């Protein structure tokens, strides 16, 4: 018999029954985050940036931001069978550490340097400052949310 895994999402505290539906929807967000983050229990209040993105009413703007940031790299990956999107994600996750990206991707650091150089050219962005990197961080958060943010 297969083992079942249970994930629990906890909504926000609700003192008024009229706010129950808000708490329920927040619990749904939390359970999706529990699944994504492979946690058994997660509270909506612990979902960080995902809380803010979930609250954006016009979900189309989230799709647009993701596309603006990642479409050129996705097209390059499709055309040349590269993995620049994955490389950028690792680069951002490791705060620009070439060695950490190389270790995670089982790739030589010179290969990572070459890819990052090309990524910067494709994006027209040096990715040096937090302000330059932020839209791409958010785009990856949005991507992680797809499949449930648009429900």
Put a short name on every predicted segment:
Residues 1-151:
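Cytosolic nucleotide-utilizing catalytic cores of signal-transduction proteins
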């Amino acid at each position: 018999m297969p083992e079942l895994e249970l994930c629990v999402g906890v909504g926000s505290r609700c003192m008024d029954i009229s706010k129950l539906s808000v708490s329920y929807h927040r619990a749904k967000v939390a359970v999706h985050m529990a699944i994504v983050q492979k946690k058994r229990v997660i509270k909506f209040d612990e979902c960080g940036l995902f809380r803010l993105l979930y609250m954006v009413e016009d979900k189309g703007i989230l799709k647009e931001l993701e596309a603006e940031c990642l479409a050129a790299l996705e097209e390059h990956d499709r055309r040349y069978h590269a993995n620049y999107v994955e490389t950028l994600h690792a680069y951002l996750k490791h705060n620009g550490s070439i060695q950490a990206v190389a270790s995670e991707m089982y790739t030589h650091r010179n290969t990572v340097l070459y890819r990052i150089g090309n990524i910067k050219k494709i994006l027209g962005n040096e990715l040096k400052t937090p302000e330059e990197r932020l839209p791409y961080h958010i785009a990856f958060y949005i991507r992680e949310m797809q499949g449930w943010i648009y429900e």
